[in-house]
Amino acid sequence: MGINNPIPRSLKSETKKAAKVLRSFVKPNQVFGADQVIPPYVLKRAKGLAIITVLKAGFLFSGRAGSGVIVARLKDGTWSAPSAIAMAGAGAGGMVGVELTDFVFILNSEEAVRSFSEFGTITLGGNVSVSAGPLGRSAEAAASASTGGVSAVFAYSKSKGLFAGVSVEGSAILERREANRKFYGDNCTSKMILSGRVKVPPAADPLLRILESRAFNFTRHDHDDNASGDDFYDDGQYSDNTSHYYDDIPDSFDSTDESSTRPNTRSSRRRGMSLGSRSRYDDDYDDDGYGRGRGYGDFDSEDEDYDYGRSPNRNSSRNRGPQIDRGTKPRANTRWEDDLYDRDTEYSRPNHSGRDYDNTRGNRRGYGRERGYSLGHGPTHPSNMSNVDDLSHKMSKTGLGNESTATNSATPTAVALYNFAGEQPGDLAFKKGDVITILKKSDSQNDWWTGRTNGKEGIFPANYVRVS
């Protein structure tokens, strides 16, 4: 287990730290099997999550303090932007020493989320009940019971790589209002953030990739599709029978390999900002600089780039198919592992020649006719084509790409990396893992190809598949 920094830092750093911590709690590995991580049944029912790293120290009297983020699941199933939080508590006893612990708190009730949203604080064991979160086979029954009011919050903790029964009763989770104002704008509050009125920033991508994974959207159909037939936990062992449920959670967020790509999802397409938004998340000025007057009223519709220097335009990247995170080289001799989170991430600057998203209307369709892909970020949907034949005809006339028609002697195939439901007539819908016979393709995977699967033919985004 790496050392995570409990000292409050910028929301950008806290969000990346939270993604790393949450991944270690929800994705099995060779050490922790599927019955030793937070079960999908619990994650699916979660109304919110608080992810915190806490430092506990004491001599006669003990105290605990830490920092992290909180997110809420919205009514449409998407996730809110992260809100910065801190944790504080005190106790009495004979403890002598120091302990560093990562916590994931599962908020099972909307009341727990609402309590924090309204007042900016919740007291564990006070205004909300808390209990140790269930693991393994007892999880489904416990998660079902939680909806009946048994416990508003499930607590999971890990210290030095082991789950530990660390008591947190009496501890308070508090809003870090200054950090939120610094990041989002002068008048931003946790209520606005957790209600979905603030758009999700690019810095939250690693965290959203976990929140939108299969583990948080587990269904009984997924359980029934298990290779073992009916045993999801497989006697507590991590095996091929259960590992595929978690293969959409990356092992690292600094990788540029295939696992770091992420298709657009509901939260990544959500633009629901009823108040407008501060478009430049300036994460570099002083903590007390939030009173300088750049708030929600200063949204600039003509320039939506963030102040992260090399961060992408949100309208050009988060709404378009799989993206590649290009991490920078690690710094040497870092004392805290959290120092890694302050590094900028390399992105290619998107093409601003066209405005392909109407921010005032908040269009949420993944492949809408008004929002094609920008060059270099994925294929542009041929929105004016009524069927596949029209597509072939127009591509042959305009010479788009160097197409090659599949022959009977060597028909290429591809395996779907992501689900694609299709957005327009003529699209080829498929599920992750489906084998697609490629009928027509170009030399680039940032394009739309023609294929056949499950007895149907149509066009599909080539960067959603891996050519066999």
From Swiss-Prot:
Biased composition (Acidic residues): 248-257
Bias type Low complexity, positions: 309-322
Localisation: Cytoplasm, Cytoskeleton, Actin patch
Record GO cellular component, one term: cytosol
Record's keyword annotation contains Cytoplasm: yes
Residue stretches making up the SH3 domain: 409-468
UniProt region (Disordered), positions on chain: 220-386
Reported function: Essential for the organization of the actin cytoskeleton, fluid phase endocytosis and vesicle trafficking, together with LSB5.
Protein name (Swiss-Prot/TrEMBL): Protein YSC84
Species: Saccharomyces cerevisiae (strain ATCC 204508 / S288c) (Baker's yeast)
